[in-house]
Design a protein with these regions (language model features):
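A SIS-like phosphosugar-recognition module
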Residues: 1-190
């Protein structure tokens, strides 16, 4: 386990630099990022989970539509829906999928002007390039970047994250309660 532990210890040291770079990247690209109405995040291998987490955080915090795809799967049908309001973010871990992540970012840049690569060397100056230092814990290195993106986006679009949220109170959300299930399927309105 020693090699894994040594690899894991690299991650916290990289977080400060990644966070600082993410804040600067967001400031430089804020207009383009805010102008999007849909965010599509791509990641290969362990970065697929980061793409999913990033999409979830954008929806939770910034109240914008977002979806995360596995890099290979997302390069087919979903690209047919891209338009000038679609922001595409490809996560590049510098390993498996790196070439496709760069290609995805490049394609989105030329199609909508809202394509970005996070991690690795990037494609151009609008990308968030950083050194990926871990082999087996890359996802932990990328997590702060997508979390900061969601947070900064929420600030830019005016979402008050300190305001309490009340989840919808509808019968649908009580589906695990047997009486609610009975009333829904029987047509009874309680």
């Amino acid at each position: 386990y020693d090699p894994y532990i040594a690899d894991a210890y690299k991650v916290p040291d990289s977080h400060k630099a990644i966070c600082e770079k993410t804040l600067a990247w967001y400031a430089a690209n804020e207009k383009s990022l805010v102008d999007a109405d849909c965010y599509v995040l791509y990641g290969a291998a362990s970065l697929w989970g980061v793409a999913l987490e990033g999409a979830l955080k954008i929806m939770e915090m910034a109240k914008r539509i977002a979806i995360g795809y596995e890099l290979e799967d997302g390069l087919h049908g979903p690209t047919m829906a891209f338009n000038e309001k679609t922001c595409v973010i490809a996560l590049d871990g510098g390993d498996y999928g790196s070439e496709k992540a760069l290609g995805c970012g490049e394609m989105a840049k030329s199609e909508s002007g809202k394509g970005f690569v996070i991690g690795g060397k990037g494609f151009d100056s609008t990308d968030l390039a950083f050194d990926v230092v871990s082999n087996d814990f890359r996802a932990l290195e990328f997590a702060p970047a997508v979390q900061i993106l969601a947070y900064k986006l929420s600030q830019s679009v005016g979402v008050d994250l300190t305001a309490p949220l009340t989840p919808p109170k509808k019968e649908y959300f009580a589906l695990h309660d047997e009486p609610a299930m009975t009333s829904i399927y029987s047509g009874d309105k309680k």
